[in-house]
Amino acid sequence: MSWQTYVDDHLMCEIEGNHLTSAAIIGQDGSVWAQSSTFPQFKPEEITAIMNDFNEPGSLAPTGLYLSGTKYMVIQGEPGAVIRGKKGPGGVTVKKTNQALIIGIYDEPMTPGQCNMIVERLGDYLIDQGL
């Protein structure tokens, strides 16, 4: 299965009539493995900052999580495993696997819980596969 299929079928899937605004699977080095057509163009330093927070949990909290210049307020996550951000009625979930970052961006009417479930479910599966 291609990485694009994971994005299209597992991240951009419909859940209770809603779906993510955009999603991507990005290597920990910042290389794009696959992304939805709507995923924003991010800056390499934004991925570096996210990786730093996984290595030093809490480092993003004072500054916020930036993706494509958009600032998300960092909310509760799982240190070293999941970072969650909020901006208005939407937000972002980032799940770290052994080799990649799974990123889901959502907006109303999708809920934070639905986004978390989609992103973390695929992340957990990839971790189980050694990826």
UniProtKB/Swiss-Prot annotation:
Disulfide bonds: none annotated. SMART domains: PROF. GO terms for cellular component: cytoplasm; cytoskeleton. It holds the Pfam family Profilin. InterPro entries: PFN, PFN_euk, PFN_sf, Profilin_CS. SUPFAM superfamilies: Profilin (actin-binding protein). It is found in: Cytoplasm, Cytoskeleton. The keyword Cytoplasm applies. GO terms for molecular function: actin binding. Keywords: Actin-binding, Cytoplasm, Cytoskeleton. The keyword Cytoplasm applies. Binds to actin and affects the structure of the cytoskeleton. At high concentrations, profilin prevents the polymerization of actin, whereas it enhances it at low concentrations. By binding to PIP2, it inhibits the formation of IP3 and DG. Belongs to the profilin family. Occurs in many kinds of cells as a complex with monomeric actin in a 1:1 ratio. This is Profilin-1. It comes from Ricinus communis (Castor bean).
